[in-house]
Amino acid sequence: MATSIKDVAREAGVSIATVSRVLNDIDVVNEDTKKKVLDAIKELGYRPNIVARSLKTQRTKTIGILLPDISNQFYPEIVRGAEDVSNIYDYNIILCNSDLDIEKEKEYLRVLKEKMVDGVIYMSSSLRDEILELINELDLKTVLVETRDKDGVLPSVTIDNIKGSYDSTNLLIQKGIKDIAFIGTKKDNMNAWGDRYVGYEKAMNEAGIKIDPELLYLDSIKVKSGYEGIQHFLGLNKKFKGVVCASDDIAMGAINALRDNNMEVPKDVSVVGFNDNFAASIFYPKITTVSQPTYDMGSVAMRMLIKLLNKKELDEPNYVLEHELIERESTI
């Protein structure tokens, strides 16, 4: 016969109401009592009736995670951090991949609402007005990762992308390199990838180096943009000694293009990336990059969301984590 909540209460020596409070993460239960209940649940192998509990509490203990590109190595580690925290608090996850398609994002948000998720972690480099409006319209408790809304209403977890790109550009400048190209996306308000162009621009301006518009290739953050960007510069017969890339994928594409044109990295051209994907550390040459604490971004975002769901005040609604510039073979 299946273990019941009464069995758990009897084993822990508490009331059924106390077991219910522990299951629903209500703060009035002290830590010693909570431990007794959790130990009893583990000992007896008790599995609560999710449907019955959701009908009673109006909560499903389910959180939706919406990410833009599951093939990008940057996002899975964020999901892992979020999932580890969700497991601690007994939340399930529904994972949605939009493939950088805003219409798919909208549809997934509607589906998550229909699934009665308790909240959403929204990952993207930017937050478009129509997505923000839909989140508000659907009344979805949401924490943003890698982006922020312009009014600062939704809680967010990011790094300082401007400072990260500034640091990587400045590394090349300190090595005496002045002809520095940039491959990424256009400057755009509230856009993490666009912020990386702003950081490049700021470092160049502060160093008194004029930016050559023909050494800008503003397309996407994918590998092909890195490859096509280098081919574009070479097609214009441009001379450059450094390339700042808005992602490690771009950097890998750029290095491959340079190699195909018989140019050595870093002997002929130094290349810096952004994100510190695993591939950046094993690519040849190993890529100098701005490392983001991706696991921490996911775990912090999930903790923030669970706090919101429990009607607790956030210590810091817009959390900015530290980045690290890691120098490897592509600039040494």
Swiss-Prot record:
SUPFAM superfamilies: lambda repressor-like DNA-binding domains, Periplasmic binding protein-like I
Keyword Cell wall biogenesis/degradation in record: no
Statement: the UniProt record of this protein carries the keyword Metal-binding: no
Any Pfam family hit: Peripla_BP_3
SMART domains assigned to the protein according to its UniProt record, in alphabetical order: HTH_LACI (SM00354)
Keywords associated with the record: DNA-binding, Transcription, Transcription regulation
InterPro entries, sorted: HTH_LacI (IPR000843), LacI/GalR-like_sensor (IPR046335), Lambda_DNA-bd_dom_sf (IPR010982), Peripla_BP_I (IPR028082)
One Gene Ontology term of the molecular function aspect: transcription cis-regulatory region binding
Segments forming domain HTH lacI-type: 1-57
Stored Gene3D superfamilies: 3.40.50.2300, lambda repressor-like DNA-binding domains (1.10.260.40)
DNA-binding region ranges: 5-24
Domain of life of the native organism: Bacteria
Function: Involved in the regulation of amylase production.
Protein name: HTH-type transcriptional regulator RegA
Gene name linked to the record: regA
